[in-house]
Amino acid sequence: MKKLLRLFFPLSLRVRFLLATAAVVLVLSLAYGMVALIGYSVSFDKTTFRLLRGESNLFYTLAKWENNKLHVELPENIDKQSPTMTLIYDENGQLLWAQRDVPWLMKMIQPDWLKSNGFHEIEADVNDTSLLLSGDHSIQQQLQEVREDDDDAEMTHSVAVNVYPATSRMPKLTIVVVDTIPVELKSSYMVWSWFIYVLSANLLLVIPLLWVAAWWSLRPIEALAKEVRELEEHNRELLNPATTRELTSLVRNLNRLLKSERERYDKYRTTLTDLTHSLKTPLAVLQSTLRSLRSEKMSVSDAEPVMLEQISRISQQIGYYLHRASMRGGTLLSRELHPVAPLLDNLTSALNKVYQRKGVNISLDISPEISFVGEQNDFVEVMGNVLDNACKYCLEFVEISARQTDEHLYIVVEDDGPGIPLSKREVIFDRGQRVDTLRPGQGVGLAVAREITEQYEGKIVAGESMLGGARMEVIFGRQHSAPKDE
C-alpha cells in the first residue's frame, strides 16, 4: 500500500512541483487552445456562410421567371464544376432548378431547412462525395487516400439556405448552396492537427524548462538538507542563517532548537560532573569510617550514625543535582532562611573525618545570628568545595569567619598552606584548571562554587591569608529575607 501511495504521491518536492506545474500548463493550454479553436470554427462557419450566400445572391440575380417557369442563364465563364452546387426551390419546397443532377444530395436537403435562412451541415460517405466531385482530380486523389485509411469515413458538407421574398417579377424562392468540397479536406480543418502538434511541442519544451525552474527554485531546500546532513555527521554546529526569506524563520527556529539542545546537553554533562565531585566528600567520610571500623578505632554504634548521615547526604546531593539539571534559566531562587553556624558545623565535622590522618584543625568564628537566605544545598555545595580545598592544601590550620549586611553574606576561609599565586587567582575558577597538579582532583569544585554564588549575584574572591596561605572570601548576594505577612 505504501509503495502505491509513493507511486501516486511522490515524496520529492521537485517531482511534485514538476507534475503540478505541468498539469496546470496542460490544462491551461487545452483550455486556451479549445477556446481559440471554437472561436476559429465559429468564425470559419460565418465566413463560409457569407461566401455561400454570395453564391446564392449571384444565382438569384441570374434567375428569370417567364411563363411560370424559372430560367437561369449562366455565363460562359461560370464553371458548372465549381466547388459549389446550387438548388432553387419554390415556396412549397418543390425543386425548380438544380445546377447539377445529384439525387442523393437532393434527398439530404431537409424540408424544414427551406422555411428560413440558415447554415447547416450534411454527412455523406466517401463514395457519394467522390461522385459529387468527379471532375476534380486533386480532390479525387485525397478522397482515395481517405478511403484507403477508412472506407466507412464520412465527409461533412456545408449548406447555406437563403429565402428571397416575392417581388413583382419573381415569386418567393429558396436558394440552397452546397459546398461540394468537404470540410475535412480543406486546409482550415488542419488547424486541429496543428493544435495537437503545438500542444505536444509546448509540453516537450515546457517540461524541461519546468525541471530547470524547479531545480533552481528548490536549491535553497537542497542546501538546507545538505546542512542538516552535516549536522548529523557533526561537521557543523548551526544552520546557515543566510537563506531565502521563506526559509529564514525555519532556519532561525531550528538554530534556536539546536542551541537549546546543546545547552541542555552541556548542562546535563556539567551537572553530572558536579554531582560526581560533590559525592567525593561523603564517600571519603564513609571510607574513613569503614577504615576506623576495620582497625577497631570506632565501634559499630559510633559508626552507624556517621554512615547514615553521609548516606543521607549522598541522597540529598543526588536529588539536588537532579533538580538543578531540570531547572531552566530565570528560575526563582528559594527564599528559605538557614542559620549558618549549624551548616558549617556539619561540614567541618565531615571534613575532620576525611582528613583525620592529616590532623587538620578547623576553627569557627560564626555568630549564631548570621543566616543564609536561599537553598540550603547551594550553601552546602559552595562551602563544602571551598572548605575541602582549604583542608586539602593547609598545613594544619583552617579558620572560618563570617559577617552579614542587609544584602550580602560574607564568609572568609583562611588556611596556612602554600597559598595561591597572584597570576592563578582567577584561573582556579575555570573548570579543569588547577594550580597544584600533583594532588588528586579534577579542578571542578571552585568552578561549581562560583557558578552557584553568581546565581545569588555574588562572587568568590581569592587572596592571601594572614596565616600565610590562601584566603577565600565567599560573598552571597540577594540576602534580604522575604517580607513577612502582616
From Swiss-Prot:
It is found in: Cell inner membrane. The record marks N202 as: Plays a critical role in the switching between kinase and phosphatase states. Changing T48 to F/W: Decreased sensitivity to repression by calcium but not by magnesium. A divalent metal cation binds at D151, D152. It is a multi-pass membrane protein. InterPro entries: HAMP_dom, HATPase_C_sf, His_kinase_dom, HisK_dim/P_sf, PhoQ_Sensor, PhoQ_Sensor_sf, Sig_transdc_His_kin-like_C, TCS_sensor_his_kinase. It holds the Pfam family HATPase_c. This is Sensor protein PhoQ. Residues 215-266 form the HAMP domain. Homodimer; probably dimerizes via the cytoplasmic domain. Probably interacts with MgrB in the periplasm, altering its activity and that of downstream effector PhoP. Changing D179R: Very large decrease in the transcriptional activation of PhoQ-dependent genes. It comes from Escherichia coli (strain K12). Residues 38-194 are periplasmic. The gene is phoQ. Acetyl-CoA acts as a non-competitive inhibitor of the PhoQ autokinase activity. Feedback inhibited by MgrB, which seems to bind PhoQ, altering its activity and that of downstream effector PhoP.
